[in-house]
A protein has these predicted regions:
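Long, amphipathic alpha-helical stalk/connector segments used for oligomerization, subunit docking
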Residues: 324, 485-597
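Helix-centric, low-specificity signal for extended rod-like, repetitive segments
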Residues: 309, 365, 369-374, 391, ...
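Transmembrane helical cores of multi-pass secondary ion antiporters/exchangers
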Residues: 1-504, 556, 561, 589, ...
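Long amphipathic all-alpha helical oligomerization modules
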Residues: 603-614, 621
Length: 663
């Protein structure tokens, strides 16, 4: 009963903190941390200690999985270099620097134990991402922070494990640590990918959305547990499974399953994140009490925590600054090279497109200047492959893939050019590296043989709580002062391009329908397709693009703010009325009269039902074609991830409304 009461009170605290966070302009995590600390110091509340495995093995995998599902895989690929620097290199450098300083200022602390403490203080917390997103900073900053948060926990735990082993056994080498880390990541990659693919195949066969959601809750653990038993990182495996699910899910899973899962997972994330910070605050009193019982000074711990916390910020800034300089040079080099090669690339793309369409022989020589290296060398290699004897279908497929690669590279260059990471953005990234509950959970994994373990635990929780409070509360002020690039509405050009994309997809469905009807009704060729081209183009275009309308005015952070369920349905009905009603009798069938005898009324009702069913079928075909077109464009990176996500959500909601059945 006591546990049940605690759980209920905790849920109410999470709900209350989330509800009032906007009013007080403080992140819910910080409010819950403060509540936990206050409650933990009440005389009626005993000292609380939570097993670290509950957080590291029970809470972190689903949280990281949920974040990975929601991240844009194309943006994650683009920012992979930044993520590797921050999630791997920065963690190692932070552990080494902090460990070296602690060795000097804490008597009797060996280098191995000091590096272990440094590893504990290295991983960042996801609360910075939620704060930055609420402030509206650019999506590129959010992607960098999200990618770092997905992987740095695993890196820190590997460094912590290696340092602890070195301190107790003294048989660890640098090469051994590197090999162990590489093996851990490779195992996690294999297990995570396999679990992601297998569970998608399983979920595609599930017909109930609730059952699918239940199965989705097992995925992070299905990935993490085997990976851990095979010597890999369970956290990385959960992340990889999430990336696979997020990338392939829209093509495999029905929209009602995805919508139900997203809503349920959002609630689960809210509860799990809230409990993490409540638990962190509640444990504060027990750690302080243990330190007081063992003798070390609380004041000394506070000063050391201030020193360690300052080092985390300085080291992060020292790594972020050269990383940004390198990224800027890389982006400029890409843009310059692409501009120099623009004419040749366009010629190559045109020839490959012609091969893909079958307009020219697939073995035709394609002129190219081979004096350049880099991209040109890779394209030349692809060209030589195209010239090898092969089937026309395979050549056309390779040519199409080459065009996709060029379009993807062009979109990458535009992305780096339009959303640069400068000093202003770097200041936000550096200041957003606050520590959190993972730091405390990792510190609790220190073995009992660690010298002054409770004292080191106190330093860890002071650094985590202090960085959350100081950096979390001042991050809005930093954003206001440095003025980084902010996330804005989709521009008119992108909106128009998405509009055209959806219209083209709808035209494809209409053309297919005309081809099918040509076989059954000779002489009716092109009737429906002509409507989109010639008959009041404004109304059909608006209807076809209903799922992308208001991208520039309604979107903030990729969330759908409204539904226009009649959009694609209106277009389908319009086409059926004009296409099937080309003669008077067909017109009467499409728009039956509402007067006449009972027999005529019965025929009219049947005609209306038939017309409604035909409209529904065409609408669903259009929606699915538009979704495929959006997903293809998203994989190439042709549009911003937020615009693609918003348009997909609108299509999903429209399809759900068309396919839903009353219970």
């Amino acid at each position: 009963m006591d546990l049940l009461i605690i759980a209920v009170v905790g849920l109410l605290a999470i709900a209350g903190a989330t509800q009032i966070s906007d009013r007080v302009r403080v992140a819910p995590a910080l409010l819950l941390l403060a509540v936990g600390i206050v409650v933990g110091f009440l005389p009626v509340v005993p000292a609380i200690e939570v097993e670290p495995e509950i957080i590291l093995e029970g809470i972190l995998p689903p949280l990281l999985y949920a974040t990975a599902v929601g991240i844009s895989t194309i943006n994650f690929r683009r920012e992979l270099a930044s993520v590797v620097v921050l999630a791997i290199l920065l963690v190692i450098v932070s552990a080494a620097v902090i460990g070296g300083v602690l060795t000097l200022v804490i008597p009797g602390l060996s280098s191995a134990w000091a590096i272990a403490v440094g590893a504990v203080l290295s991983p960042t917390d996801a609360v910075a991402i939620s704060i930055a997103r609420r402030l509206g900073v650019s999506q590129r900053i959010i992607t960098v922070l999200e990618g770092e948060g997905l992987l740095n926990d695993a890196t820190a735990l590997v460094v912590l494990s290696s340092a602890s082993t070195a301190a107790t056994a003294g048989a660890v080498t640098v090469s051994g640590v590197v090999e162990g880390f590489a093996a851990s990541v490779l195992v996690a990659l294999a297990v995570g990918w396999a679990v992601g693919e297998l569970t998608l195949h399983l979920r595609a066969r599930i017909t109930d959305a609730s059952v699918d959601t239940v199965v989705s809750f097992t995925i992070p653990f299905l990935a993490a547990i085997p990976a851990e038993h095979m010597g890999g990182s369970g956290l990385v495996a959960a992340v990889i499974a999430g990336l696979v699910t997020g990338h392939r899910g829209p093509r495999v899973l029905p929209p009602d399953h995805r919508i139900a899962g997203q809503e349920t997972w959002h609630t689960a994330e809210l509860v799990l994140e809230g409990f993490i910070f409540l638990i962190m605050g509640l444990q504060f009193f027990g750690i302080v009490e243990e330190v007081l019982a063992e003798g070390p000074s609380i004041t000394t711990a506070v000063w050391l925590a201030i020193l360690a916390g300052g080092l985390t910020v300085l080291v992060r800034a020292a790594v972020v600054a050269p990383m940004l300089a390198w990224l800027r040079r890389r982006d400029e080099r890409y843009a310059t090279r692409w501009e120099e090669m623009s004419e040749s690339v366009q010629a190559f793309e045109g020839r490959c497109s012609a091969i893909a369409r079958g307009d020219i022989p697939d073995d035709m020589q394609i002129p190219w200047d081979r004096s350049r290296r880099g991209l040109r060398r890779r394209i030349n290699r692809a060209l030589r492959l195209h010239r090898l004897p092969t089937s026309p279908e395979r050549s056309r497929r390779r040519a199409s893939q080459a065009v996709d690669r060029l379009r993807r590279r062009s979109a990458d260059v535009e992305y780096y050019r339009d959303e640069p990471l400068g000093l202003r953005e770097g200041a936000v990234i550096a200041w957003a590296g606050m520590r959190g509950a993972v730091t405390l959970a990792a510190a609790q994994t220190l073995p009992a043989s660690a010298p002054n373990r409770s004292f080191l635990l106190l330093i860890a929780i002071l650094v985590a709580a202090g960085s959350l409070i100081v950096q979390g509360l001042t991050l809005p002020w930093v954003v206001k002062v440095v003025k980084p690039s902010m996330e804005g509405p989709a521009d008119e050009e992108e909106r128009s391009e998405l509009l055209r994309l959806l219209i083209i997809a709808a035209k494809g469905v209409v053309a297919e329908r005309d081809d099918e009807r040509d076989g059954a009704l000779p002489g009716a060729a092109g009737g429906s397709a002509a409507i989109i081209e010639h008959d009041d183009p404004a109304a059909p275009e608006r209807a076809a693009a209903g799922s992308a309308l208001e991208l520039s005015s309604s979107r903030r952070g990729g969330a759908a703010t409204g539904i226009i369920p009649q959009s694609t349905s209106a277009l389908a009905a319009h086409i059926l009325r004009r296409g099937d009603g080309e003669d008077a009798s067909a017109g009467r069938r499409a728009e039956p009269a509402r007067t006449g005898g009972s027999e005529e009324s019965g025929r009219d009702a049947a005609a209306r039902r038939e017309f409604a069913a035909a409209t529904r079928r065409m609408t669903l075909d259009m929606i699915r074609a538009q979704r495929e077109a959006l997903l293809d464009a998203g994989e190439l990176g042709l549009y911003s991830a937020g615009s693609i996500e918003y348009a997909l959500k609108r299509l999903d909601y429209e399809e759900v409304m068309l396919t839903a059945r009353p219970q």
